[in-house]
C-alpha cells in the first residue's frame, strides 16, 4: 500500500511499526516522505499515494475523494503554530502568556534536559521587536509553510481579528527554510510549526504570537493540525485499526523507532526529536474521539463561514 507522510519525528514515530512490518495483518507500506505542502497539492489533484498526511485546512477541498482516518494525525493543546520576527532577543512562550515554558514543562515530564527554557541564556524576558504589535505586519511579508496548511488557516483567522490594516503579503516556503529567511531579513516574519517551537531562540528570533494559545482561548478546543486521509472506497476501519496498532506499538516500544526517527530528522538533535514526539503524539493521535472531531468541525466550519475554505458536509468527516 502506498502512503505519504513527512519526515518529521511525530510521523516517523507513529508509522515506524507499520512501515517495518511489525503490525500483524497490515499490508506492506511503500512510503514516500514528502513535505505537507506537497501532499496537500497531491490530494487537491487526486494524485499521489492512496493514503497521505495532509493539513486539516486542506480537508474541505478533498472530502469528496478522500475519507478522514480518525487517528494517526496531529491534534492537541499547547502545540500551535508561532508567528516569529527578527529582533534583539527571543521572547519565550512563558514571557508572552505567563505560562510555563514548553521546554521546562516537558523536561519535568520526561526527565530530558538541555533545551532552552524561559530562564536560560536563550531567553530575554524584556526583549522587544518592531513586530510585537500584530498591526506591524500589515503590508509586510510573512513566510508560511503552505497556503493550505492549518497553520496558515489559523493565521488567517487570527489576522482577521488582530491586524486591522489588512493581511500581510504571503510567500510559501518549506517550513525548514522559514526561520533562516526571517533571520536573514528575506521576509519580515514567519509562521512556523513543529520543532521550531523549541529551536527558534537559536536563530535570534522573537515570538509575536502563538496561534494555538489564541485558538484555545477563543474556543476552548484543541488545535487540529495534520490529518491522515485515504481514498474513498478503501477499508477505513482496517486502516484505523492498523494505524492505532502502530501508535500503540510506538508508545510501548519507544526505543525501537529511535534510529528510524533520527534518520529522517535531518539535523534535529535526539532531544528535540523526543520533545517533538511528546508534544505532537498524544491521545488524539490514537483516536480523534468526539472532542477531536468537534475541534475539526469547529475550525473548518468557522473557516468555511468566512470564505477561507469551501463549504462542506460535516457528515463527510465521519464517513
Regions found by a protein language model. Name each.
Residues 233-302:
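Secondary-structure end/capping motifs
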Residues 24-38:
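A short beta-strand-loop structural module common to alpha/beta enzyme folds
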Residues 173-263:
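Pocket-lining segment of extracytoplasmic ligand-binding domains
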Residues 35-37, 43-60, 64-65, 174-175, ...:
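Beta->alpha turn/N-cap motifs
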Residues 2-20, 34, 81, 85-98, ...:
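Bilobed "Venus flytrap"/periplasmic-binding protein-like clamshell domains
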Residues 2, 65-74, 141-142:
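A structural signal for short loop-to-beta-strand junctions that line the ligand-binding cleft
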Residues 42-45, 182-183, 303:
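Hydrophobic residues within well-ordered alpha-helices
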Residues 70-95, 119-131, 215-232:
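Hydrophobic/proline-rich hinge and linker segments of small-molecule sensing/allosteric domains
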Amino acid at each position: 500500500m502506498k502512503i505519504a507522510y513527512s519526515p518529521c519525528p511525530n510521523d516517523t514515530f507513529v508509522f515506524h511499526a507499520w512501515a517495518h512490518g511489525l503490525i500483524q495483518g497490515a499490508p506492506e507500506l511503500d512510503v514516500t516522505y514528502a513535505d505537507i505542502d506537497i501532499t496537500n497539492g497531491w490530494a487537491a489533484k487526486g494524485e499521489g499515494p492512496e493514503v497521505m498526511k495532509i493539513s486539516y485546512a486542506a480537508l474541505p477541498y478533498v472530502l469528496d475523494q478522500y475519507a478522514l482516518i480518525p487517528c494517526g494525525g496531529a491534534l492537541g493543546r499547547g502545540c500551535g503554530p508561532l508567528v516569529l520576527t527578527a529582533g534583539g532577543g527571543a521572547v519565550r512562550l512563558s514571557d508572552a502568556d505567563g505560562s510555563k515554558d514548553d521546554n521546562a514543562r516537558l523536561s519535568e515530564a520526561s526527565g530530558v534536559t538541555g533545551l532552552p527554557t524561559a530562564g536560560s541564556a536563550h531567553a530575554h524576558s524584556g526583549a522587544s521587536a518592531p513586530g510585537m504589535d500584530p498591526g506591524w505586519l500589515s503590508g509586510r511579508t510573512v513566510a508560511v509553510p503552505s497556503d493550505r496548511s492549518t497553520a496558515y488557516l489559523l493565521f488567517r483567522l487570527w489576522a482577521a481579528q488582530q491586524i486591522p490594516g489588512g493581511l500581510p503579503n504571503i510567500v510559501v516556503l518549506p517550513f525548514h527554510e522559514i526561520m533562516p529567511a526571517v533571520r536573514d531579513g528575506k521576509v519580515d516574519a514567519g509562521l512556523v510549526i513543529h520543532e521550531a517551537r523549541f529551536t527558534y531562540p537559536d536563530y535570534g528570533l522573537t515570538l509575536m504570537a502563538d496561534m494555538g494559545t489564541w485558538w484555545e482561548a477563543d474556543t476552548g478546543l484543541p488545535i487540529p493540525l495534520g490529518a491522515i486521509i485515504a481514498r474513498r472506497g478503501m477499508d477505513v476501519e482496517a486502516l484505523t485499526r492498523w494505524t492505532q496498532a502502530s501508535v500503540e506499538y510506538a508508545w510501548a516500544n519507544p526505543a525501537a523507532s529511535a534510529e528510524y526517527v533520527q534518520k529522517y530528522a535531518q539535523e534535529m538533535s535526539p532531544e528535540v526529536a523526543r520533545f517533538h514526539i511528546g508534544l505532537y503524539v498524544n491521545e488524539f493521535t490514537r483516536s480523534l474521539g468526539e472532542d477531536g472531531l468537534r475541534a475539526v468541525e469547529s475550525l473548518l466550519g468557522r473557516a468555511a463561514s468566512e470564505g477561507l475554505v469551501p463549504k462542506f458536509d460535516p457528515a463527510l468527516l465521519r464517513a
